Amino acid sequence: MNIQALLSEKVSQAMIVAGAPANCEPQVRQSAKVQFGDYQANGMMAVAKKLGMAPRQLAEQVLTHLDLNGIASKVEIAGPGFINIFLDPAFLAEHVQQALASERLGVAKPAKQTVVIDYSAPNVAKEMHVGHLRSTIIGDAAVRTLEFLGHHVIRANHVGDWGTQFGMLIAWLEKQQQENAGEMALADLEGFYRDAKKHYDEDEAFAERARNYVVKLQGGDPYFLDMWRKLVDITMTQNQITYNRLNVTLTRDDVMGESLYNPMLPGIVADLKAQGLAVESEGATVVFLDEYKNKEGEPMGVIIQKKDGGYLYTTTDIACAKYRYETLHADRVLYYIDSRQHQHLMQAWTIVRKAGYVPDSVPLEHHMFGMMLGKDGKPFKTRAGGTVKLADLLDEALERARRLVAEKNPDMPADELEKLANAVGIGAVKYADLSKNRTTDYIFDWDNMLAFEGNTAPYMQYAYTRVLSVFRKAEIDESALSSAPVVIREDREAQLAARLLQFEETLTVVAREGTPHVMCAYLYDIAGLFSGFYEHCPILSAENEEVRNSRLKLAQLTAKTLKLGLDTLGIETVERM
């Protein structure tokens, strides 16, 4: 149920009858304050200006044509021409019943789209580090949300699995006589990478051999391809352990590495030349873009092939967008890549559009994000100043959560404690990130993220168990409530019900904008409203059975909404804490 969409349609119809143009925007929003009702229509200002009349006068005319019978109990004009809408308690009660009768809590499925989501993108022969966390978990929240809404989502893990470094690594593996790279652990590979780079920089004969190996690898030599595959397999096996720990939905089947697009690159360069978009410049092949200027104010040159014949990331990204439209049949493509890559992506996509590889009707969206910072406001590092491995971060999260849970539950059995610590620790790391607006940098702070108060995973997980405890105390089977009516008489009942019925609206925003913090804020709001409702509207000691059962049903919808909402974020819930 999308009440905002329903009201928008009703207000829009009334505005048109009142003389507004057919494409008028009613600007129906959820009200920020309870005294302004549940929703507010703010579109009178802009439309009245076009019509040459006072906004309040237009609002009065709209009200005479606005039919909200059975939806709103009160509609009033506020200030210069805002229309405040107060939902009818009977309407709320009816839709709470409908939400409870549906596994999807009444959430409709929009027109199905094929959506490709590019996220995570670690590099081969390197262990995942904290820099991969944001893309991985924000991207996965988008995947879960869009899949829940019924879209066909294709996960694209754009792994860095190609380039000159592989000649260097294979040469070093050979030098060390590692006959079976498949048995090496990734930690060894990290060391190998450092050693290989050192030799590459210091030993010219080794560097020459590495360069020759790259040529053989790119030429498809079976021996070198086999060595390359081993490096990829070791890396992705290790990364899958991290994905499983993080409770993200990526698997080996989702790997679409840079190497996938290699066969397309010569054809793309040739086609861009044939279209007159790419030209030779100082031996390289370049696309000059009027949309981007260099320091001299001239069109910026984007190199797509170096003078030695090598290709660049831009060339791969052009091929990648083309493949996602032509082969994967994407209706929409989302990229969860940090904000520093924005201009690079925009330039690649400008070329893609000019070349006609992806039509304008298919959005290419850069859902960029900021950096994860330490308490000092600088990029998050180890005490020694090195990069923090993601596995080490998750180990620390688990250890801290284990201590926290044991402190609060000294008698809890070890296996139960471990399960709870995992849900709390991993949930805390993910939620701390997801609850922040992705476009900004955020401070990583263990104390804040593991707190049991505020907008944190432990608080949200506890809020869920608190609602469940009501049913344990009531000693009632939830299914026994199915025939009981919902009756809304108190303000706090109405406020909780109205917010619960905004679940679909919240999902719609997250799906459109790729902003999981909106879902976090919504769920935190629900938890707070339930707390006030629980305190002021007795459930188990209600004045009669009808009120008791009705309030139990509000509690039931609260629990289901919290669980489903947290699931779209990839945050695990527990039944006891």
Curated annotation (Swiss-Prot):
SUPFAM superfamilies: Anticodon-binding domain of a subclass of class I aminoacyl-tRNA synthetases (SSF47323), Arginyl-tRNA synthetase (ArgRS), N-terminal 'additional' domain (SSF55190), Nucleotidylyl transferase (SSF52374). It is found in: Cytoplasm. Its EC number is 6.1.1.19. It catalyses: tRNA(Arg) + L-arginine + ATP = L-arginyl-tRNA(Arg) + AMP + diphosphate. GO terms for molecular function: arginine-tRNA ligase activity; ATP binding. GO terms for biological process: arginyl-tRNA aminoacylation. The keyword Cell membrane does not apply. Belongs to the class-I aminoacyl-tRNA synthetase family. It comes from the Bacteria. A motif ('HIGH' region) lies at residues 122-132. Monomer. GO terms for cellular component: cytoplasm. It is an enzyme of class 6 (ligase). This is Arginine--tRNA ligase. Keywords: Aminoacyl-tRNA synthetase, ATP-binding, Cytoplasm, Ligase, Nucleotide-binding, Protein biosynthesis. InterPro entries: aa-tRNA-synth_I_CS, Arg-tRNA-ligase, Arg-tRNA-synth_N, Arg-tRNA-synth_N_sf, ArgRS_core, DALR_anticod-bd, Rossmann-like_a/b/a_fold, tRNAsynth_Ia_anticodon-bd.
